[in-house]
A protein has these predicted regions:
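Active-site Asp-x-Gly
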Residues: 56, 226-283, 290-293, 329-335
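Helix-rich C-terminal or lid/interface subdomains of diverse kinases
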Residues: 163, 279, 283-360
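Conserved ATP-binding subdomain of kinase catalytic cores across diverse folds
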Residues: 23-170, 244-246, 257, 262-271, ...
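ATP-dependent phospho-/nucleotidyl transfer catalytic cores
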Residues: 24-28, 48-49, 55-59, 114-134, ...
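Juxta-kinase regulatory segment immediately upstream of eukaryotic protein kinase catalytic domains
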Residues: 1-24
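Protein kinase-like catalytic core scaffold
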Residues: 45, 86, 109, 212, ...
Length: 366
């Protein structure tokens, strides 16, 4: 990419070297515009333009990121780790802010580039899945005593399953696209699990599940893997860091990581929860947590997997009923296919729940 005046103006606002030699698009993310900067010193940085249409409160978001990364740096230093590789490091502007606002009102930020490490979009083998589990567990461990209530809720009610259920019922009632009659079976699947939707929210309200710092996008591609050792070194993409439940972060990883089928698989006979991969993740996650979670949190990990899968399927069905406005679709009925896949996974997990609990008990005793 040509280093135009706009890029020069933006980078000059940050505390960086003088001679920028290259600016190229970087990574496979779909939300923010991301570039890798190279300076004549050989040092690299990541420059990002934040997507305000998705993250409508960029200042609050950056306050979350700043607070969490500063905390992580302190913990990593105390543990004798490498702060430049084991957490994201924000570069401040010359005004002392973690972001710069350009003439068009766009928000930009700069991170140190983590050298000799890679993000993978797909799980190559179970070791990758295990490493991501260790990393997200370790993330919980390092942030266990962070005051989660001080974080901004940048996406309100993101994993409030009761709120999602209310929105679903409204979509069924309004039936703006006249699709409800064709999906009565799927609608009934949700209504039959009204009590399920309340389980984790009720436990949080009753103080049985503590508020934690949660990542809310616990995919493999948000983990940096060291090129030399193959070990996970850093959790990235902290834009959705918010107060939440640890079991939800765990559950979302299982939802897509331990499924035997693609998220939009039409042949539902191919869709189930792979208990071997589930066990791989449980082992890594509990190891990474290092005793940071409560007994109740550990006991509810299987329920987190079921509920996150149920919530996701319900969101796909809600979007289908409302006319496919939220999730991008690539064919007719795409959201319905996604919904059916998630519901098949829920049913399979419900049937395997006792085994899923046994696996957690096996590793929480270690």
């Amino acid at each position: 990419m040509e280093i135009n005046r706009e890029i020069k103006n933006i980078t000059s606002a940050f505390v960086l070297e003088d001679n920028l030699t290259e600016c190229i698009p970087y990574g496979s993310g779909h939300i923010n515009d991301t570039y890798r900067l190279t300076y004549d010193t050989g040092k690299h940085y990541i420059l990002q333009k934040m997507n305000k249409s998705i993250f409508t409160k960029p200042v609050e978001l950056m306050e979350n990121v700043s607070g969490v990364t500063a905390w992580l740096k302190k913990k990593i230093q105390e543990n004798g780790g490498d702060v430049e590789r084991e957490t994201l490091n924000l570069v401040m502007t010359k005004d002392g802010l973690p972001y710069y606002v350009d003439e068009d009102g766009e928000y930009w930020r700069v991170y140190l580039f983590i050298e000799n490490a890679t993000c993978y979009d797909m799980v190559k083998d179970e070791e990758d899945f295990y490493q991501s589990a260790v990393a997200f567990g370790h993330f919980q461990r390092l942030l266990a005593d962070y005051p989660a209530e001080t974080l901004h809720e940048t996406i309100v009610n993101f994993h409030n399953t009761v709120d999602r259920l209310d929105k679903f019922k409204t979509a069924v009632e309004k039936d703006v696209c006249h699709r409800a009659a064709d999906v009565e079976k799927e609608i009934q699947f949700v209504l039959d699990r009204t009590e399920l939707a309340h389980v984790l929210c009720d436990m949080q309200d009753q103080g049985k599940l503590p508020l934690r710092v949660t990542h809310n996008d616990t995919k493999l591609n948000n983990i940096m893997i060291d090129n030399a050792t193959g070990k996970a070194i850093c959790v990235i993409d902290l834009d959705t860091v918010m107060p939440g439940l640890s079991v939800n972060d765990f559950g979302d990883s299982i939802r897509f990581g331990a499924s035997t089928g693609a998220e939009d698989e039409k042949d539902l006979t191919k869709v189930s929860c792979n208990l071997h991969l589930y066990e791989v993740y449980v082992k890594g996650f509990i190891e990474g947590c290092g005793g940071a979670l409560t007994e109740t949190e550990l006991d509810m990990l299987p329920m987190g997997a079921i509920l996150m899968t149920f919530e996701c399927g319900m969101r796909f069905l809600t979007d289908y009923l409302e006319g496919d406005h939220y999730f991008k679709i690539h064919r007719e009925g795409h959201n319905l296919d996604r919904c059916r896949t998630q519901f098949k996974l829920v049913k399979d997990m419900e049937e395997k729940l006792s085994r899923m609990k046994e696996i957690v008990n096996k590793y929480k005793q270690v």
